[in-house]
Amino acid sequence: MASRRDVLIMLGVGLAAATAGVVLAPRLGHPPAGSEIAALRGARLTGLDGQPARLDALNQHILVCNFWATWCPPCVEEIPALMRVRESYKARNVEFVGIAIDQAAKVREFATKLAISYPVFLADESGIELVRTLGNPSGGLPFTLVFDRSRQVAARKLGALSEQEMARMLDQALAS
C-alpha cells in the first residue's frame, strides 16, 4: 500500500509532466518563426521546364504554398479549388505556388492536363524533409502554408482544403 507521501510525489510528477506537455506541445512540430521562409527559399526546386527555380520573386505577395503529388487523391481533388480561390484573390496580391513531390514527367503531364493556373515547382527527393522542416512532422500531403507579407506563417494545414477554409486563411493573412 502506497504511503501518503508516495501518492503526493506521484501526483507532483504527474502534474509536472502535464504542465510540460501543455507548454511544449504547441511548439513541437513548428519551427521557429521566420525559419520557414528561409527553408523554402533555400530548397532545391526546379520548374516544369527542368530549370532551377527560386521563390524570391514573390516578396510582395501573400504566398500560398501547396505541397502535393499526383499519387495523392486529396491533393488532386483540391487543385481545382485552389485555382478558383487564386483567381478570386489575384487582385489582392495573393500568389499561389504548388510544389510537387513526385516524378517530373507525371507532374508535367498532370499540370498540362488540368491547366494548373499557378506556378508549379518540383522538389527533389528532399521534398518530404522540407515539409517536415516547415512544420509537418508526419510528412503527409497535401500540406499548405500561407505566408503573410512579413514572411511569417499565417496559417498551415495538413490535409485537403475547402475553398471556404482557404478563403478564411487568406482573409486572416490579409487583415494582419
Functional labels for PLM-detected ranges:
Residues 55-72:
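Short active-site neighborhood of thiol/selenol oxidoreductases, capturing the structured segment around
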Residues 112-116, 125-171:
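Thiol/disulfide oxidoreductase modules built on the thioredoxin-like
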